[in-house]
């Protein structure tokens, strides 16, 4: 049996409103729906998945710090912090855990202020515009990278 992978999923501000906030942009699934499906998918592949959603930047940073030497890979949807947070960038660089940046909407097809990410250039990859499936694609990619598949 392969060794269990420990994966952390982080979701930033306002993602707790998924399913009610702008469903034409973000889809109709709630964050709980997305995380439950992802957790089930992860368990089938011997991946232990933990999750945090926070509207507070410092809580996301603390969770990243706590992940040092405990977590193998991070999937992060930084939401609005994508475009503003040097602190999240520095935290991710500081722990040196590989990560994939995920966005439900295509940020490049939206307002110009959403086109810049403080994380993309240090991420293993970026998935945007594919809705909730983007999390599943990120999970599969993380597993592939860690297991050299």
Curated annotation (Swiss-Prot):
Pfam families in alphabetical order: DHquinase_II
PROSITE patterns linked to this entry: DEHYDROQUINASE_II (PS01029)
Keywords: Amino-acid biosynthesis, Aromatic amino acid biosynthesis, Lyase
GO molecular function, one term: 3-dehydroquinate dehydratase activity
Organism of provenance: Psychromonas ingrahamii (strain DSM 17664 / CCUG 51855 / 37)
This protein's encoding gene: aroQ
UniProt name for this protein: 3-dehydroquinate dehydratase
Function of the protein: Catalyzes a trans-dehydration via an enolate intermediate.
Enzymatic reactions: 3-dehydroquinate = 3-dehydroshikimate + H2O
BP GO terms, sorted: amino acid biosynthetic process; aromatic amino acid family biosynthetic process; chorismate biosynthetic process; quinate catabolic process
């Amino acid at each position: 049996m392969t060794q269990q992978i420990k994966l952390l999923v982080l979701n930033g501000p306002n993602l707790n409103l998924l399913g009610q906030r702008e469903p034409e942009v973000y889809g109709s699934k709630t964050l709980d729906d997305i995380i439950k499906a992802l957790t089930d998918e992860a368990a089938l592949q011997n991946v232990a998945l933990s999750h945090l959603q926070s509207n507070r930047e410092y809580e996301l940073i603390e969770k990243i710090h706590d992940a040092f030497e405990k977590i193998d890979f991070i999937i992060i949807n930084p939401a609005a912090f994508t475009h503003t947070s040097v602190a999240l960038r520095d935290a991710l660089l500081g722990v040196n855990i590989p990560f994939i940046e995920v966005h439900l909407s295509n940020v490049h097809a939206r307002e110009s202020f959403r086109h810049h990410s403080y994380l993309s250039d240090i991420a293993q990859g970026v998935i945007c515009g594919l809705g909730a499936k983007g999390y599943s694609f990120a999970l599969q990619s993380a597993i592939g990278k860690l297991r050299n598949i």
